[in-house]
From Swiss-Prot:
Extent of Low complexity compositional bias: 184-214, 230-283, 330-348
Ranges of Pro residues composition bias in the record: 73-89, 169-183, 215-229, 284-298
Protein name: Mucin-7
Glycosylated sites: 97, 128, 135, 146, 176, 182-183, 188-189
Alphabetized UniProt keyword annotations: Asthma, Glycoprotein, Repeat, Secreted, Signal
Origin organism lineage: Eukaryota, Metazoa, Chordata, Craniata, Vertebrata
Tissue: Expressed in salivary gland tissues and only in those that contain mucous acinar cells (e.g. sublingual and submandibular glands) and not in salivary glands containing only serous acinar cells (e.g. parotid gland).
Sequence repeats (start-end): 165-187, 188-210, 211-233, 234-256, 257-279, 280-302
Modification comment: N- and O-glycosylated. Contains fucose, mannose, galactose, N-acetylglucosamine and N-acetylgalactosamine.
Subunit annotation: Monomer.
Cell location: Secreted
Alphabetical GO biological process terms: antimicrobial humoral immune response mediated by antimicrobial peptide; killing of cells of another organism
Organism: Homo sapiens (Human)
Disease field: Asthma: The most common chronic disease affecting children and young adults. It is a complex genetic disorder with a heterogeneous phenotype, largely attributed to the interactions among many genes and between these genes and the environment. It is characterized by recurrent attacks of paroxysmal dyspnea, with wheezing due to spasmodic contraction of the bronchi.
GO CC aspect terms: extracellular exosome; Golgi lumen; plasma membrane
Length: 377
């Protein structure tokens, strides 16, 4: 029992001794830092005459600076002039420099003189490029006039006339980028080739080219693309009576309704004329059989789909039958105009509306079924 207090006393004394020694060491370190004096030794150094160490003046030692900024700059030698002279200093040889500078100025003045002609030539070439479509339209109109006059004068010019008319419409279509207006003229151009096969008499063969010469005029006279496909057909109607010949007027109507034997298919081998007859004959499937699978455009497919859905196609097909029986050519022209307008309106409006109506009906049925199921639950 007595050993415990003794052990505690010994520990306390040792701690106090160590703490006191630590305080003394800290005091010595602080004294050295503040006064910068080493502790006094037991013996003193011998006294030398002269200034003490702290009284001697500080002598700087010269050291080499390795940086470029510390190196002294050499004076510029006349043989090797500086690469980048100061701009403020005038040149040493003004005569030579002036003679050298002047050619550069002349060269700079000559450069724009060379560039100006190039700009002028560019400006002159641009109007030529812009005038090309106008020239093309004027040439196409001239060709149309020439074809109409040549057809009216001679009968044996029948073969070149349809070619000219078929070549003429594409030029105005290029100038007027309107798909509906371009789809309408081929219907009018389709009329001439079939009657040429049905009417084998020479006067009648001279007549169809007149009808072919008439249709190309509407695309030239109707440059407005926004108008629907019907207006160009209405404008195409007046040129047919302007011919005022009985044969051509009778030839304008039959192409829509005549289920002609395979002879017209042999005569109508042109792609434009072959693709158009199925467009005009919407209801009867016989003309489509007569045409021997030409590279028809997607337009005929639209026309075949339209008459099936719309009931208005039946009266249009019945009207031309009466026109065939009637001998008066004037009635045939009127009926042909009406049928053309109806057939063109159908493909533009019917297919899209039918698809939309079917889709809406399907959605309504689904909604009704869902509502019924919810109510039953």
């Amino acid at each position: 029992m007595k050993t415990l207090p003794l052990f505690v006393c010994i520990c306390a004394l040792s701690a106090c001794f160590s703490f006191s020694e630590g305080r003394e060491r800290d005091h010595e370190l602080r004294h050295r830092r503040h006064h910068h004096q080493s502790p006094k030794s037991h013996f003193e150094l011998p006294h030398y005459p002269g200034l003490l160490a702290h009284q001697k003046p500080f002598i700087r030692k010269s050291y080499k600076c390795l940086h470029k900024r510390c190196r002294p700059k050499l004076p510029p030698s006349p043989n090797n002039p500086p690469k980048f002279p100061n701009p403020h200093q005038p040149p040493k040889h003004p005569d030579k420099n002036s003679s050298v500078v002047n050619p550069t100025l002349v060269a700079t003045t000559q450069i724009p003189s060379v560039t100006f002609p190039s700009a002028s030539t560019k400006i002159t070439t641009l109007p030529n490029v812009t005038f090309l479509p106008q020239n093309a339209t004027t040439i196409s109109s001239r060709e149309n006039v020439n074809t109409s006059s040549s057809v009216a004068t001679l009968a044996p010019v029948n073969s070149p006339a349809p070619q000219d008319t078929t070549a003429a419409p594409p030029t105005p279509s290029a100038t007027t980028p309107a798909p509906p207006s371009s789809s309408a003229p081929p219907e009018t151009t389709a009329a001439p080739p079939t009657p040429s096969a049905t009417t084998q008499a020479p006067p009648s063969s001279s007549a169809p080219p007149e009808t072919t010469a008439a249709p190309p005029t509407p695309p030239a006279t109707t440059p407005a693309p926004p108008s629907s496909s019907a207006p160009p057909e209405t404008t195409a109607a007046p040129p047919t009576p302007s011919a005022t010949t009985p044969a051509p007027l009778s030839s304008s109507a039959p192409p829509e309704t005549t289920a002609v034997p395979p002879t017209p298919s042999a005569t109508t081998l042109d792609p434009s004329s072959a693709s158009a007859p199925p467009e005009t004959t919407a209801a009867p499937p016989t003309p489509s059989a007569t045409t021997p699978a030409p590279p028809s455009s997607p337009a005929p497919q639209e026309t075949t789909a339209a008459p099936i859905t719309t009931p208005n196609s039946s009266p249009t097909t019945l009207a031309p039958d009466t026109s065939e029986t009637s001998a008066a050519p004037t009635h045939q022209t009127t009926t042909s105009v009406t049928t053309q307008t109806t057939t063109t309106k159908q493909p533009t409006s019917a297919p899209g509306q039918n698809k939309i109506s079917r889709f809406l009906l399907y959605m309504k049925n689904l909604l009704n079924r869902i509502i019924d199921d919810m109510v039953e639950q």
